[in-house]
Amino acid sequence: MFNKVTKTFQYGQHSVVLETGEMARQASGAVLVSVEDTVVLATVVAAKKAKAGQDFFPLTVDYIEKTYAAGRIPGGFFKREGKPSEKETLTSRLIDRPLRPLFPEGFYNDVQVVIHTLSVNPDIDPDIPAMIGASAALAISGIPFNGPIGAARVGYVDGQYVLNPTATQLKSSKMDLVVAGTENAVLMVESEAKQLSEEIMLGGVVFGHEQMQAAINAIHDLVRDAGKPDWDWQPAPKNEALIAAVSAAAQEGLNAAYQIREKQARTTKLREVYAAVQAAMAEQAAQAGQPAPDSVGVDNILFDLEARIVRSQILNGEPRIDGRDTRTVRPISIRLGVLPRAHGSALFTRGETQALVVATLGTKQDEQIIDALMGEYRDRFMLHYNMPPFATGETGRIGVPKRREIGHGRLAKRALLPLLPAPEDFQYTIRLVSEITESNGSSSMASVCGGSLAMMDAGVPTNDHVAGVAMGLILDSGKFAVLTDILGDEDHLGDMDFKVAGTETGITALQMDIKIQGITKEIMQVALAQAREGRLHILGKMRDALEGSRTELSAFAPRMLTIKINPEKIRDVIGKGGATIRALTEETGTQIDISDDGTIVIASVDETQAKEAQRRIVELTADVEVGQIYDGSVLRLLDFGAIVQVLPGRDGLLHISEIANYRIANINDVLKVGQPVRVKVIEADDKGRLRLSIKAIGGIEQQQSGTAEPAAQSEPQAE
């Protein structure tokens, strides 16, 4: 019934099993990947024909996590999985990026890659098995695909590279790098690091590419035994006559357009050229008695012509699109404290790219609780990236963030994360929001720069500024040029774009997408060195604007006071059913967070109210000391004395013989319920019961005359 084929290979410390032929047999290709109890099913289906008028490659990649993989039932009312999580979105992008360049030019059939996580070992992230599975499913499907690819995660522990480290090992690793590529070329890199040098980062890329050959070889073996016949597909023949006609009609206009340095004016000129060429081609066809050529085909020819013009200008040493040379960063403008009520804000402008980044400080209660498949955790640092359509002078949909926005936000977050102060040094939750108000390339790196500035403006004690720069590469016939701070057009027309963020010390985030084969280690070394040069230039501009973190928080940011109590006293602060802490927060207008170790953090915009809450907590948790004098209150009267509260929740017996220096016949003659009295603690037994005395400090008659000894004062101690 089943024709199951299995291949096993050793991959670092893990054994990886590839299986096909048993599950999802109606898909074009399906592979089950197992790595130490983490199991993913990767499937691919391709349409046999492209849709009419299709002018781009419609690849869809969906990575899907099911809670049953971790032995859990989804929360919520419906008890089933809902919209994709951020992890699912980011992993889908991670798989998409190295696969997309390997489909042949002109292949416009719908292709859908779906990866389900069926079982998860919390120590092994499913993303690498998912990438290997997607590559294997495509390779055995027969769909036109210039793969397979391999993928590897690389850590850096104790000065050594580690292949596919576990989640536990990553906690002590200075690098978390994912690299994907073919046998001969690296295609994609995604990494975060703790200020490592360019040499170490590049070494990690090379190490990962070398090690992934084991996965690529296993996929080749699987294809040999279980691969389907290759599709009989050929790209549509090029219309050389149309190409020549379009080139002749457009060359002069396109050359003129790319002499215009300002983006909007250049875009307007390009639209005019496109419209004029379309009209000219239609007119020529009409004169020849033929139908007008396909407008999509004409546009594609024009785009290829644009690419040749821009690339040849750069390789021949001519100025770039906006007039710069290959190493110059666009002019930078920085303004701080832009928003009066925000806790911190920065407007970072680099050429025609602009980011308004806003920092907001919150309490532990504002942390994001993430119910991840590999285990729930709390996140005290959030970075949200938004790019509305007006940033590029366009109209469009406004709504939930798209995959691109989520990916850019994650990259910027990775860049800034290593510089955050430890939670014990800065207990605030931090949220950064990057609003892209203009975009012409490198908006994610503008978010990094603006985010670093906004945090310092808010008083977050980061150790150093973090800057980011987007780089590009043009490679043709052995000649190459590395471009610093690329424009949007250079991104589309180039062969590699990579983003590098970090401090003067080293790299904190690296993202690389390579669109062609033939890029050597030496070219990447040049590119990384040039990126460092650009990054240091930007860091200098940022330091000129703000040397270091502000010493004072915004007046609108919450103030935090920290006290430490005996953990056994926590119940006294919370009270029965939470009544005590609820009353405390409502009456003082504060937020109070209590840790199991007895650490209490009080937060309030009003520092006076925070100190009042602190005082009351100290009272609630103070220990009564024998020999100390306290201001108390009579709770109730007894025939033989009174019960007096000396501290919140602590009371003792005041015997009738310890009230005055004379004999009292009736307790009601000297005390009333609610009456304030000053008492001395004269005894505490092993059960914590207190004996009190007024006589020991002069007697009730002295208090009534106003000459009583003062009570002890408890001073709250803030950490």
UniProtKB/Swiss-Prot annotation:
Keyword Acetylation in record: no
Tell me its EC number(s), please: 2.7.7.8
Which stretches make up the KH domain? 558-617
Q: What class of enzyme is it?
A: transferase
Single GO BP term = mRNA catabolic process
A GO CC term attached to the entry: cytosol
* Keywords tagged on the record: Cytoplasm, Magnesium, Metal-binding, Nucleotidyltransferase, RNA-binding, Transferase
GO molecular function (one): 3'-5'-RNA exonuclease activity
What are the S1 motif domain coordinates in residue numbering? 627-695
Q: Enumerate the CDD domains for this protein.
A: KH-I_PNPase (cd02393), RNase_PH_PNPase_1 (cd11363), RNase_PH_PNPase_2 (cd11364), S1_PNPase (cd04472)
Q: Where in the cell is it found?
A: Cytoplasm
Q: What is its main location?
A: cytoplasm
Designated name of the protein: Polyribonucleotide nucleotidyltransferase
- Provenance organism: Bordetella pertussis (strain Tohama I / ATCC BAA-589 / NCTC 13251)
